[in-house]
A protein has these predicted regions:
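Hydrophobic alpha-helical transmembrane segments of multi-pass integral membrane proteins
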Residues: 1-430
Length: 430
């Protein structure tokens, strides 16, 4: 088992560090908008690319490698140092290039990311194939999702190079939604549906409903992309209804599976189930945004803060909650496998680490959830109060405080888990 840079744990810890640092940048830009003194726009793009590539994409890669290691597929393989370096160079190039508005840096970062896609995709597919619910339809579903990742990188390169200025708006829409809708959102839904039942030690409540979700979700996503490309709100709303019904079916199926498993509770399951709740909020909010623009002028004013609220319902409420759930599940098991060679002694050490990760889980999940809801509340308040209102500023600082509290708490628990070694005889695996 590999140790150091290139190991699954290194992907997870480095990805979490990227996410923390870029989250601070994002909160600073949000506060700047609310206070009427926006920070340079380059910082916003640094936040976006750093969080998505250095943070979320690296964490997803780490979770895939962790899954392979935990089922014994990676015990005799060397570390993934090349992928680790390439992914972090890609994040650094994209983030710094976005901040400095340097297209050459962005293109270099995009090239590193493009070169990392093949090994990254292979590990993700191999990891999900270990799930009992893997089917040919799941393989097709994941292939479509990974195509979205490839597409967003290629379209991002076209944008950075400014090679097709006439198509800039269309390319930008494709770049955004191929990555966010096809890869992150759709891929995460499929991953949760495949991974949650084994975590609960229970088969999926309805296999047929699960297959319907895998079939309809790409169709709804394709319809939504078509609506965006054609600037047709009616197509967007029709596709949105399809997505809402499909996602509701997925959530019902997973919640029923959890209920049949005896409603087990851990910080991992808490975050994953909360992510499902925000998944529905995200879709309903998107439908409301689409309905709002049917009026001319829009029925309710819609500006930068409202866009931030909508997108971060997805980023923090759904994606981050799900990734944190995976992180809380993987870290104790990785450390136990890495540090204890004895099969008899390993469970006791793993339970000790799980106890650390489960501490104050209600506070951790609640702070992250209510902090996200607070971001939605802030722009809603601007419909009735000015930005200078004490109501708005109170909601802003409360939301920021809750989010920072949750992130800080999780970081402290990860640090404590990494720093807790097994008592007695132990051996580190190389």
């Amino acid at each position: 088992m590999s140790r150091g840079p290139g190991s699954p744990l290194s992907f997870l810890l480095t990805g979490w560090a990227w996410l923390l640092l870029t989250a601070l940048v994002g909160l600073a830009t949000f506060l700047g908008v609310v206070r009427g003194s926006p920070l340079p726009p380059g910082l916003r793009m640094l936040h976006v690319h750093g969080a998505l590539v250095g943070g979320m994409l690296q964490l997803l890669t780490g979770l895939a490698l962790a899954a392979l290691e935990l089922v014994g597929h990676e015990t005799k393989r060397p570390g993934h140092l090349g992928l680790f370096i390439g992914l972090n160079l890609a994040a650094l190039g994209l983030a710094s290039g976005s901040w400095l508005r340097d297209s050459n840096l962005i293109l270099i970062g995009g090239l590193f990311l493009l070169l990392s896609l093949l090994p990254m995709s292979r590990h993700m597919v191999q990891a999900l194939r270990t799930c009992p619910g893997w089917t040919p339809l799941a393989a097709l579903f994941l292939g479509i999702s990974l195509t979205g990742l490839f597409g967003t990188v290629v379209l991002g390169g076209f944008l950075a190079g400014a090679w097709f200025p006439t198509w800039h708006g269309m390319l930008r829409l494709g770049h955004l939604h191929a990555g966010l809708l096809l890869f992150l959102t759709m891929g995460m839904v499929g991953t949760i549906q495949l991974a949650l039942p084994p975590l609960l030690n229970r088969p999926l409540r309805s296999t047929g409903a699960g297959q319907i979700v895998l079939l309809l979700l790409p169709s709804g996503a394709a319809g939504l992309l078509t609506g965006f490309m054609l600037s047709s709100v009616h197509i967007q709303l029709t596709a949105g209804i399809c997505l809402l019904v499909t996602l509701a079916l997925c959530v019902w199926n997973l919640l029923s599976t959890w209920s049949q498993a005896g409603q087990p509770g851990s910080v991992a399951t808490d975050h994953l189930l909360t992510a499902l709740f925000f998944l529905l909020i995200m879709e309903v909010t998107g439908m409301a945004v689409g309905l709002n623009v049917l009026w001319t002028p829009p029925l309710m004013p819609y500006g930068t803060l409202h866009l931030v609220a909508y997108t971060h319902t997805a980023f923090i409420g759904f994606l981050l909650q799900a990734i944190v759930g995976g992180l809380a599940y993987a870290v104790p098991r990785l450390l136990a496998v890495r540090r204890v060679t004895s099969q008899k002694k390993r469970p006791a050490y793993r339970e000790q680490l799980e106890h650390i990760m489960d501490r104050w889980r209600a506070i951790q999940v609640s702070c992250l959830s209510f902090g996200t809801l607070g971001l939605v509340l802030v722009p809603s308040l601007t419909w009735n109060f000015p930005l200078t209102s004490s109501w708005v500023h109170t909601a802003v600082w409360t939301s920021v405080g809750l989010l920072l509290s949750s992130l800080t708490l999780l970081t402290m628990k990860i640090a404590q888990a990494v720093g807790t070694h097994p008592t007695g005889e132990r051996a580190a695996r190389n």
